[in-house]
Swiss-Prot record:
Full protein name: CDP-paratose 2-epimerase
Cofactor list: NAD(+)
Any one Gene Ontology molecular-function term assigned to this protein's record: CDP-abequose epimerase activity
Keyword check for Isomerase: yes
């Protein structure tokens, strides 16, 4: 099999690429190396085996068309994208060009030149908006959604908020419509929070990794307070990279069953954490005290998002295996090693 990964030097892309190399898959990695850690991930991948690296920009139609026509991949994990809510607000045009324009470039190249190529697209829970139409309770450490105690499924109303939600939502819908109208083999994963090794987190993207960085700093004697947005009771279900690898490659083996569908993806309610609960895990594991100052709530932030994954579980018999506690410890250990 010939596999293309756009954004293949990012966190998720590099994890998927490393597994592909371990399986002897013919791999093409496409990336513009603009994100923090991307060059480091490329060097790491290069130490694992041989693959084709293409330095290009998903916004450039010619780059994408040449990519598809030259390599004619059997399958593609489309991960290239602008991934930060805050960046989308600072620069909505760039956010649109990458997430919508870039996705259309890929879809059109596949439609015109390689229509049998399978595409699995990494979308987001932000397509559901701020979810303020639901009722919430507040405990000492977290918010809980009264109306959706087991999480949100795919029947949840689409409600794009923020430029990021709009751009990812538009790409999400183009993926589904190209399956419906043009018969392409596309699949959409609406992700909650992902974390794991090779995640060079930043303040506005990759919250588990970011706060693991803070824990490492505190453990090393850097005790200045850090900031969080809101009161720390916001909840997400977290999914470790090992489970992401299992998901994507299991899905790839079952594309005929799931093409043209969107799936909510996450660690489920049993692997859900608030910021405060994450801090407690890190404090206990590292024997530290995590002190922070509060900033205002971020625009369009969800108080709770937990994925109900019954649809994908029923379709391909996949579910998470790495617990939040074990995964956070793995994340901390990797962060402290770099």
């Amino acid at each position: 099999m010939k596999l293309l990964i756009t954004g293949g030097c990012g966190f998720l892309g590099s994890n998927l690429a490393s597994f592909a190399l371990s399986q002897g898959i013919d791999l093409i990695v496409f990336d513009n190396l603009s994100r923090k850690g991307a060059t480091d991930n490329l060097h790491w991948l290069s130490s694992l085996g041989n693959f084709e690296f293409v330095h290009g920009d998903i916004r450039n139609k010619n780059d994408v068309t040449r990519l598809i026509t030259k390599y004619m991949p059997d399958s593609c994990f489309h991960l290239a994208g602008q991934v930060a809510m805050t960046t989308s607000i600072d620069n909505p045009c760039m956010d649109f060009e990458i997430n919508v324009g870039g996705t259309l470039n890929l879809l059109e190249a596949v439609r015109q030149y390689n229509s049998n190529c399978n595409i699995i697209y990494s979308s987001t829970n932000k397509v559901y908006g701020d979810l303020e139409q639901y009722k919430y309770n507040e405990t000492e450490t977290r918010y809980t959604c009264v109306d959706k105690p087991n999480g949100y499924d795919e029947s949840t109303q689409l409600d794009f908020h923020s430029p990021y939600g709009c751009s990812k939502g538009a790409a999400d819908q183009y993926m589904l419509d190209y399956a419906r109208i043009f018969g392409l083999n596309t699949v959409v994963f609406r992700h909650s929070s992902m974390y794991g090794g090779r995640q060079f987190a930043t303040y506005d993207q990759g919250w588990v990794g970011w706060f693991c960085q803070k824990a490492v700093e505190i453990k090393n004697g850097i005790n200045k307070p850090f900031t969080i947005s809101g009161n720390g009771k916001q909840v997400r279900d977290v999914l470790h990279a090992e489970d992401m690898i299992s998901l994507y490659f299991t899905a790839l083996a079952n594309v005929s069953k799931i093409r043209g569908n969107a799936f909510n993806i996450g660690g489920t309610i049993v692997n859900s954490l608030s910021l405060l609960e994450l801090f407690k895990l890190l404090e206990d594991y590292c024997n530290i005290d995590m002190r922070f100052t509060n900033l205002p709530v971020r625009e369009s932030d969800q108080r709770v998002f937990v994925a109900d994954i019954k649809k994908i579980t029923n379709a391909i018999d996949w579910s998470p295996k790495v617990s939040a506690k074990d995964g956070v410890q793995k994340m901390y250990d990797w962060t402290s090693s770099i």
